[in-house]
Amino acid sequence: MKAYQLTIPVENKPCILAQITSILARKKINIRSATISSFGDSGFINLIVDNPKQGQKALRKEGIAVELKEIITVLIDDRPGGLDELLQILCTENVNIENGYGFVIESRKNAVFVLDVKDAERAEDVIKASGFKTLTPQELSEIEPFHYVGY
């Protein structure tokens, strides 16, 4: 089963992110993960939401350009070298990562690495054949957030 993220090209100026989150909030779409990157006057917002197709529809209805991108979410060990193991396998198989980011989860004491690649099916086959677990959209939406304790 495929997972998706919303990728939104944006101008680098105040209130853009708030405009996007407001639209999604009004439609009761929950944001599970967000990354924001800018380069000069523009950038991208990547969102994993609980209903990506409805999120895309809501944003487009408000005139916001948005792409629904297939992603692979991989469960990795949260330890030094955990991400490197995955990336070395993908490198050996010549899989180019166009976009990627990760986050730690408490429920499994692991991390999730999100990959955006051109050939997701082949990349997912390589990942699974190497013993890594990929998360279904349902598993992704049910992740409990990691809570830092003991500041």
Residue ranges and their predicted role:
Residues M1-Y151:
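A conserved regulatory-domain signal marking ACT and ACT-like small-molecule sensing domains
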